[in-house]
């Protein structure tokens, strides 16, 4: 019997959650270099998604007299924030999915939306293709969103009613088709979304909204729509989603990569503390922005105010929309929103280093709040007491805590919201139910094996009468190489071992940790050497080995 031996090293991916409907995530907007600085916070928070955007014209296009005249190729290939974005993805691993939005504000760089076929539009596509290839960006994102609030960025006047709707529709259709061609040529698997529309219930005359929706509804290369909700009133999230689903008839996936109630808060940034102030050791005449500056200084000095004090201030005002995060999340659930990314952290410094009477209070929408409430005993950011309880309730109430797909297997870690008397159903692309089993009441996970690589499966948790408790569509990983690869990652307290790229002539394999045989889902995380003995039908054995990295 001959022996084939390979020594392979892979990284341990410490991450938190996977993809299913209503997954929560972290939005970093243009600060795509920030996630790498908050890896431990992202792990601790158990978010499922990380989202950022890139301003294509501002960063990567040459502009002269309101016309796009070229591409800054070197600027794209040496863009350090792009590299850091990808480094964060690799540090977080398979279960945290990344979303990249492409911000293309035509109003600032051209007189109108360029026509399809013009040099200006070709420059946009050229820059995008180079960006997607740089640092393997395209291979590390799950979703690519074409556009970012185009109602404002394409508008030619202040009423937002004349925004080159037809030209923008043509642009998005051509963009989606180009992206699909690149995907096919390069083996990229990200999903294409259009968006991100904002305030749709306030813009009944907008040309841009129906143009974007038309592309979503009619272009088969577009998977769904990104919908932002920056609301003035707490019921606006419901209004926006209802209009998209009912009036415009969008049946494809929805995601929400930005949401806030900052517009309801901004008019009050200079409100006085009043009676609350005198009761808590401040003056009645102190303004909210002055209070925020003061407590930021205290947090920076290591003597932050208490979460109770901070929360009580805002809840003393009748205008503050209590539990707005919970209200929004209920809307996201109702309309089956696939991914939800809100502001994650508020740290010292940044664009709003000092507040004044005109500062917009975006930061009150952050989940973690070290700028105002400092760090806890373990060095982690203290949370925002106005939102954090609702964030935790939403996160921990999910039916699925983690969902990790390999090439031939699917690992599901059940969350607190799962009905353990339920039935797991897995259906293939032909509509054939390939798995139907009751959940194991003794285990908090389910491992589904013997799936086909590169195949989309519909996975659902059902009641006994087949009523759906939770569902998602999951695509197994495609075979990407000729040689077997041993991989592992930590998933909710388990080690999940995956053998990738196994050829058809494999008859069996064994996985061992420090010489002791283990299952591919293993509770022991304390070993040092992980090996897999792969036996082929001709009797040969291939040994794969990797060192566990803590």
Model-derived features with residue positions:
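Aromatic- and acid-rich polysaccharide-binding/catalytic face
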Residues: 50-52, 100-102, 142, 148, ...
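Substrate-binding cleft/loops of secretory-pathway carbohydrate-active enzymes
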Residues: 197-226, 233-240, 265-274, 347-361
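Substrate-binding cleft of secreted/luminal carbohydrate-active enzymes
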Residues: 259-265, 270-397
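Hydrophobic beta-strand segments within extracellular beta-sandwich modules
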Residues: 459, 530-532
């Amino acid at each position: 019997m001959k022996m084939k031996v390979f020594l392979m090293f892979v990284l341990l991916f410490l991450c938190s959650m996977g993809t299913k409907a209503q997954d929560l995530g972290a939005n970093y907007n243009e600060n795509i270099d920030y996630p790498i600085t908050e890896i431990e916070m992202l792990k601790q928070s158990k978010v499922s998604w990380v989202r950022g955007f890139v301003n294509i014209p501002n960063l990567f296009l040459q502009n002269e007299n309101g016309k796009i005249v070229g591409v800054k190729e070197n600027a794209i290939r040496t863009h350090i924030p792009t590299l850091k974005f990808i480094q964060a993805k690799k540090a977080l691993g398979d279960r945290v999915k990344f979303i990249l939005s492409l911000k293309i504000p035509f109003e600032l760089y051209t007189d109108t939306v360029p026509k399809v076929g013009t040099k200006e539009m070709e420059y946009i596509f050229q820059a995008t293709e180079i960006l997607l290839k740089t640092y393997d960006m395209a291979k590390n994102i799950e979703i690519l969103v074409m556009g970012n609030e185009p109602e404002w960025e394409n508008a030619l006047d202040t009423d937002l009613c004349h925004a080159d709707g037809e030209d923008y529709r043509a642009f998005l259709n051509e963009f989606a088709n180009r992206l699909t061609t690149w995907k096919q040529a390069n083996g990229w698997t990200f999903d294409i979304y259009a968006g991100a529309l904002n305030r749709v219930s306030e813009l009944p005359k907008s040309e841009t909204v129906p143009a974007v929706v038309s592309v979503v509804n009619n272009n088969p290369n577009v998977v769904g729509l990104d919908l932002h909700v920056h609301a003035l009133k707490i019921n606006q999230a419901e209004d926006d989603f209802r209009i998209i689903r009912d009036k415009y008839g969008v049946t494809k996936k929805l995601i929400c990569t930005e949401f806030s109630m900052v517009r309801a808060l901004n008019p009050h940034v200079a409100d006085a503390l009043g009676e609350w102030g005198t009761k808590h050791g401040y003056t009645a005449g102190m303004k909210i922005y002055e209070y925020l500056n003061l407590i930021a200084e205290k947090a920076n000095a290591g003597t932050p105010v208490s979460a109770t004090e901070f929360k009580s201030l805002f809840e003393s005002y009748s205008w503050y929309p209590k539990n707005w995060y919970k209200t929004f999340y209920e809307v996201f659930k109702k309309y089956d929103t696939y991914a939800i990314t809100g502001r994650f952290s508020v740290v010292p410094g940044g664009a709003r280093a000092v507040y004044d009477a005109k500062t917009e209070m975006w930061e009150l929408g952050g989940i973690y709040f070290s700028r105002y409430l400092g760090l806890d005993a373990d060095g982690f950011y203290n949370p925002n007491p106005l939102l954090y309880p609702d964030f935790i309730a939403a996160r921990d109430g999910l039916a699925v805590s983690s969902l990790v797909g390999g090439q031939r297997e699917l690992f599901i870690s059940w969350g607190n919201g799962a009905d353990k008397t339920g039935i797991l159903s897995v259906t293939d692309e032909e509509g054939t139910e390939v798995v139907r089993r009751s959940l194991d009441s003794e285990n908090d996970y389910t491992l589904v094996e013997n799936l086909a690589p590169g195949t989309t499966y519909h996975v659902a948790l059902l009641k006994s009468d087949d009523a759906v408790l939770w569902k998602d569509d999951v695509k197994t990983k495609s075979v990407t190489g000729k040689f077997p690869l041993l991989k592992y990652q930590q998933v909710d307290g388990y080690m999940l071992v995956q053998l990738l790229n196994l050829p058809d002539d494999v008859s069996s394999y064994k996985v061992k940790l420090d010489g002791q045989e283990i299952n591919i889902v293993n509770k022991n995380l304390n070993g040092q050497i992980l090996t897999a003995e792969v036996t082929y039908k001709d009797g040969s054995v291939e040994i794969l080995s990797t060192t566990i990295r803590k």
